[in-house]
Amino acid sequence: MQTPSSASAESEKDSGNTYVGPWLLGRTLGQGNLAKVKLGKHFQTNEKVALKMVYNDELEDKDTWKRLQREVTILRQLHHPNIITLYQVFRVPKYTVLALEYMDTDLHSMVVKHNRLDECTTRKIFRQIVHAIDYCHLHRVAHRDLKLENILLNKDLVVKLTDFGLSNFMLDGSFLSTSCGTPHYAAPEVIQGRYYDGCDVDVWGCGILLYLMLVGEFPFEDVTISNVLSRVCKGIYTIPSFVSSSASDLIRQMLMVLPTSRIKVAEIMQHPWFIADLPTHSRLPSRTSSFSSKHRSVTFSPPDLAILFDPSITSPSSSVGQIPQPTDHSALSPSKPMSISGTESPNPDPASLCYSSYEDLYSATSWHSDMAESSGFLDPTDIPPIPSNVETLRSSLPQRHASFMNKVYNHPLSRPPAPNRLRSLRWHYGIQTAKNPIEVLRKLCEALLELGARFRPCDEESFLKENKYKVFSCITCHNSPVYLVIELFSIGPSASVIDIRFSSSDDSIKYTSSYSPMPFLEVVKQLILKIA
């Protein structure tokens, strides 16, 4: 069977059928301002996919393009049975299309249909979500947009985590600051606009998901969004009595307002409720800190499109930042697939467009063996964070929300008492001091001058985000430059924390496995002695 042909590069019509590239378009699965998702069937193999069609006009916006670029980059890096698979990326005059793995339904539809789920079903789904999140964190990826609609399912309740558009890479010693996601799912530190750890935010999202599955409504639901955000920041919610004590305990540990008191993913996987009814041999061992550098095979049409998603590919006719336009329909034909390696397939097989990723996922070298590889990982510094804001969206459970609103208006508003003040932490990060921040900064500058350092404050755009001050410095130790990032955090009206970490942002020094930490430790010791 030959590829359908037509004068249109965007779509083809043959006996009433509409094609985009090699895919026959079906029903619309979802619609948004920037993109729409349609069901697609391959013209030869009949393989079903979900076609995420992003309007090219929207990609003229730099932030939108970076978001799409980051999503493709992350999906190429992650290999896990519970993470959605990306098969192909191609471009037509009106859309840039991502061919994604097709699933039967999502968790939102399932919760709406059944009102709430039993604990056995909830546990089966929640385990897969946590395993996927743990794998993301192992590869230094924070999802940051966990919600019912982003958890896809098939008829066998196999979970696939999707929509990595708001995800970000995490660097050692660095925090994230972008406010993103949906208000009902947002963590307190995100709502307050403070710096946060992406792992802690994902744990909060897991807590919201678990509550929704067991109860059928949001834990912090209220009449107005402002009240919702206030309840989130204060941690005001109740757990119905029909939820088991073990599940309630796990929810409370995940929905701790203070991020440092929040349970970690590894601890979730050892919680009694999580491992209940799970055979001992099936319990996952402690993960290692290895990273995989193997990327999934993804085809690009036209071939120049691959350059935009992988800077290592070079072409004399295209450069990064220029979006290529197809000149004829042959660029969309499956007879010219291009892998990310940048080489054309001499004997292309149309079925490979669909099954190459299946082979990667379910072959003998599964994702477990990928985790054992430690040759490196994707450099996240190539993709800068994109600014965003928390948006006020409609409730994703409209029927439950309407019922809650009627109940609130028919009865006086009652709030549970605020939780008792958490006891002070016995452990803290960095060097804690009770001195005035201005005095600490003065001593810090004097110490840097005495050590012969060159230093500068952060730029105005990232200057002092309410509770943080940053200084970049360079100190010479044994004829070797040591670059430092010194941050002063305010953790209360009478306490501050100084954090000193190594920086590899300068081109003259790159952090590698062979780099000795001794100059850094020597400089930090001298600096601490000066300001003590």
From Swiss-Prot:
PROSITE patterns: PROTEIN_KINASE_DOM, PROTEIN_KINASE_ST
Name the UniProt record assigns to this protein: Protein kinase domain-containing protein ppk9
Entry remark concerning the domains of this protein: The protein kinase domain is predicted to be catalytically inactive.
Subcellular localization: Cytoplasm; Nucleus; Cytoplasm, Cytoskeleton, Microtubule organizing center, Spindle pole body
PANTHER family per the UniProt record, alphabetical: MAP/MICROTUBULE AFFINITY-REGULATING KINASE (PTHR24346), NON-SPECIFIC SERINE_THREONINE PROTEIN KINASE (PTHR24346:SF110)
Signal peptide coordinates: none
Keywords: ATP-binding, Cytoplasm, Cytoskeleton, Nucleotide-binding, Nucleus
Composition skew (Polar residues), residue ranges: 316-346
Positions of the Protein kinase domain: 23-274
GO CC annotations, alphabetized: cytoplasm; cytosol; mitotic spindle pole body; nucleus
Region (Disordered): 316-349
GO molecular function: ATP binding; protein serine/threonine kinase activity
Residues at which ATP binds: 29-37, 52
Catalytic site: 145
